[in-house]
Amino acid sequence: MTKKQVSQERKARVAQMQRQEKARERRIRLQIIAGCVALLLVLAAVITYAAIDARKKQPDVAISTFGVSAAAAACSPVTTDPAKGNGVHVGHGTSTPTTTKVKYATVPPSYGPHFAQPIVADRKVYTAADKPAIENLVHNLEHGYTVLWYDQSAGEAKMDVLRKIADAVNKLDASKDKFIVSPWDPAYGAFPAGKKFALSHWSATLGADKASVASQAGHRQLCGDISGAVVKSFVESYPRTSAPEPFGA
């Protein structure tokens, strides 16, 4: 082997060693990057879990501090009525387009025929100036919502408390953004004397196919004053998952 050949072979070995070293360094860098990414993902998961856990726990403490105590709210016991009317749409776009108002069996309604469209919006608190139609909100009840109705003569003065309750309740697992506060329309019937606030929910047990309704009921509770503790107890007793159409928006 000539000196030139030896030199070329040596250069080739050196070049190969350099390539191997660079490949090794590249593998190390990739392993470090992968490790950092994995660590960041774990940290993100931990932070997300902690945030969700804190979100779940915080409303439980806060809700009971809003408004008056349960004892001071002067609430009647929850009334449970046999329910019907699921899937019965009236008004525009239905087979009964001239029906613009439903005469409900209870005040406030907790079940019954309703307009074809529920209220689908990020807003959860309404005033007299922009209140949805009762018939739209009954459709929301069918989808698992709880509605807190308020007498406008008393509710307007307590809008700050109502907003705080709505914000906190919508973070509960029992509600998860299915809680609406809206003024009551006395044209649909007057609240009993001394009652200014009312909760209603349309519950149901689904059949094995998760589409048919095996049984259903309407639930109402009327109060003289607003109590976060009462609201929390009601929505946890009648959660969003108990409804004729719990998967509706």
Enumerate the language-model features and the residues they cover.
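Terminal targeting segments of Actinobacterial cell-envelope proteins
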Residues: 1-28
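N-terminal Sec-pathway targeting helices
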Residues: 25-37
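Hydrophobic membrane-insertion alpha-helices, especially the h-region
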Residues: 34-47
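Juxtamembrane cytosolic interface motif at the C-terminal end of transmembrane helices
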Residues: 46-54
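Extracytoplasmic low-complexity, Pro/Thr/Ser/Ala/Gly-rich segments
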Residues: 54-135
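Mid-length scaffold segments of soluble, non-membrane domains
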Residues: 124-174
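Helix-rich interaction surfaces within compact, conserved domain-sized segments
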Residues: 168-249
